[in-house]
Amino acid sequence: MLQLASLSDRMAVERLARQVHALHCQWRPDLYEMPELLYPEERFVDEIRSRSLYIAKLGDTVIGYVLLKIRDSQGIGLVNRRVMVLQEICVEESLRNQGFGKEMVADIHALARAFRCTDLQLGVYPQNDEAVSFYQKCGFTIRSIEMQKKV
């Protein structure tokens, strides 16, 4: 289902990214605000060049996208790992709970294997119950809890 994004997909990705970012702004107004563009042309081109941005289509319509990064973890006291980080994922709001997200995650898993990654990793806000449940159904487990204190 996933394919590399092309320049012509920019506005569709922007529209989808705004759906997700609106939730981030709602949950963490101390961190997020809605910019004029989440994917200005330069950023979009950079993500395409780095082969990090993928889209999902239904017919000719972009219905989802993912932004992936690969991180090699190594250092003193660390097991060498190659982790594919799922930085952003979105399925069009009106098409959620129809299996498209699961299909996208299956494709991400296949990409991770192709890139010889040892793990898939993502972050999700705990108040996003729907997403937490979805990721758990896809086989993800909670590995850490991030904490913060206002100064």
Positions of PLM-derived features:
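A short helix-loop-beta-strand connector motif used in the catalytic cores of GNAT acetyltransferases and
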Residues: 42-55, 85
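Conserved active-site alpha-helix within GNAT-family acetyltransferase domains
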Residues: 102, 114, 126-144
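Conserved beta-strand-loop-alpha-helix junction that forms the acyl-donor binding cleft
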Residues: 107, 118-131, 148-151
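Conserved acetyl-CoA binding element of GNAT-fold acetyltransferases
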Residues: 79-93, 123, 148
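A short beta-loop-alpha structural element at the N-terminal edge
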Residues: 1-16
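Conserved GNAT-fold acetyl-CoA-binding loop/helix
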Residues: 21-43
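Conserved acetyl-CoA pyrophosphate-binding loop and the N-cap/start of the following alpha-helix
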Residues: 95, 99-107
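Conserved beta-strand in the GNAT
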Residues: 55, 61-70, 85, 90
